[in-house]
Amino acid sequence: MVLESTMVCVDNSEYMRNGDFLPTRLQAQQDAVNIVCHSKTRSNPENNVGLITLANDCEVLTTLTPDTGRILSKLHTVQPKGKITFCTGIRVAHLALKHRQGKNHKMRIIAFVGSPVEDNEKDLVKLAKRLKKEKVNVDIINFGEEEVNTEKLTAFVNTLNGKDGTGSHLVTVPPGPSLADALISSPILAGEGGAMLGLGASDFEFGVDPSADPELALALRVSMEEQRQRQEEEARRAAAASAAEAGIATAGTEDSDDALLKMTISQQEFGRTGLPDLSSMTEEEQIAYAMQMSLQGAEFGQAESADMDASSAMDTSEPTKEEDDYDVMQDPEFLQSVLENLPGVDPNNEAIRNAMGSLASQATKDGKKDKKEEDKKEEDKK
């Protein structure tokens, strides 16, 4: 990389108050100087940059230094005043370059001219010949008063370059929103192949210079916007899904709580309606009640697992089920099998046998009674 010491000459005349460059010429110049300083120091860490004003006394604000922060802090203290003296400012910058510490550094002057140059063309050409002899390159950014200055400054740069030289440049920038953008794409900051000296991919949005490839920069910007919209949509969907899951979990908890409450109430009602005074019952009545409770418990479990939509149909069939249950309870063989499977119950116990016998005799009587009623109904029909 080229080792270079650069003096930046800034225009601080009254013309810099104009607003043809946003927000003013002076502030647009500050942004451009910022880019120049960073470009020079990043291209080579050993490069040095100094700062000098062109108006009135051509004051040297900072001598050659690699500290861009120091340069920029001095730059922001500059206020518009008076008129520029272009030739004097260039001579002072040349003297500052002669006192550079690194004698192997090439010398370069970058001058911002935003005011009319009052020096005549002969003086400019004479100064250019002297600088060429000293091997000093000069880059000029001509803006704001390009109609007045372009001819003089072109003669100055052409004299510096000679017939074959290309070390010095003149960049004329028409009024526009950004002086810095025009400078980035200019030969002053462009190396071989158009690469920006000291400006990596991180200095441009999406890593692409919009002036070098505007179509690619636009495509990347559109793609980035679409990606941002997709991410926002996915975030909204995820938030909605999380809210829906939370709502389902809450509803499920409420449903389970309601079911548990209903079951508890049903069990309490069942206990109140079906719990007689066991102390007043005989042993045979207690055994019969135990068998009845086991049957009712089975029916209760089946009723809890049944579909709620069939409740009306179940209500209409309750008399039939009660008759079937009564018939089952009066079946001695079924009761005998139930007693044999009950733990701690001896089917051969005398009390159990007596209870079974009484149930059997009752069943026989009921059967005969039902038969008589059926015969009587048939006779009435005849």
Curated annotation (Swiss-Prot):
Cross-link (Glycyl lysine isopeptide (Lys-Gly) (interchain with G-Cter in SUMO2)): 122
UniProt keyword list: Isopeptide bond, Phosphoprotein, Proteasome, Repeat, Ubl conjugation
Ranges of biased composition (kind: Acidic residues): 321-330
Chain ranges of the VWFA domain: 5-188
Any Pfam family hit: VWA_2
The keyword Transit peptide is assigned to this record: no
Region named Disordered: 224-252, 301-382
Record PTM Phosphoserine, positions in chain: 256, 266, 358, 361
Biased composition annotated in UniProt, kind: Basic and acidic residues: 224-237, 365-382
Gene Ontology biological process terms from the UniProt entry: proteasome-mediated ubiquitin-dependent protein catabolic process
Sequence intervals crossing the membrane: none
Chain intervals for the UniProt region annotation (Interaction with UBQLN1): 197-262
Domain UIM, chain residue ranges per copy: 211-230, 282-301
Family membership noted in the UniProt record: Belongs to the proteasome subunit S5A family.
Subunit organization: Component of the 19S proteasome regulatory particle complex. The 26S proteasome consists of a 20S core particle (CP) and two 19S regulatory subunits (RP). The regulatory particle is made of a lid composed of 9 subunits, a base containing 6 ATPases and few additional components including PSMD4. Interacts with NUB1. Interacts with SQSTM1. Interacts with UBQLN4. Interacts with UBE3A. Interacts with UBQLN1 (via ubiquitin-like domain). Interacts with DDI2.
Name this polypeptide is given: 26S proteasome non-ATPase regulatory subunit 4
Species of origin: Bos taurus
Lineage of the organism: Eukaryota, Metazoa, Chordata, Craniata, Vertebrata
